[in-house]
């Protein structure tokens, strides 16, 4: 699963996920993409589950790019532990997603196959997404 190799600080404050994606909002590598319409967090497990669904559907053809990386640690206290005594240990990593961010890209397959693969992947994700194609000349 995806997670940072090392971080300067183990824990991070919660923060607020606001605004629209300005970077990573265009299809850059492949011909087709899966773009976020809603906002939220994607865990490393969700990113991997969607990747597996796409890879299984396109079989040997095509290439997939993952355009997001879970770099934010989410901490949690153990069950039945009283409040206080500091922040819990990092449990898993998430990627903060803003509307407009391209999550995955695909190349080397026809549009119908790409649409179906992205539909299967979108079913694994907790945010609304849409299918996009690369602009001509970019």
UniProtKB/Swiss-Prot annotation:
UniProt keyword list: Ribonucleoprotein, Ribosomal protein, RNA-binding, rRNA-binding, tRNA-binding
Subunit relationships: Part of the 50S ribosomal subunit.
Native source species: Thiobacillus denitrificans (strain ATCC 25259 / T1)
One of the protein's GO biological processes: translation
Its biological purpose: Binds 23S rRNA and is also seen to make contacts with the A and possibly P site tRNAs.
Region described as Disordered: 1-22
Protein's UniProt keywords contain rRNA-binding: yes
One Pfam assignment: Ribosomal_L16
Protein name from the UniProt record: Large ribosomal subunit protein uL16
Gene3D superfamilies from the UniProt entry: Ribosomal protein L10e/L16
Bias (Basic residues) ranges: 1-13
GO CC annotation terms, alphabetical: cytosolic large ribosomal subunit
Record family assignment: Belongs to the universal ribosomal protein uL16 family.
Annotated GO MF terms: rRNA binding; structural constituent of ribosome; tRNA binding
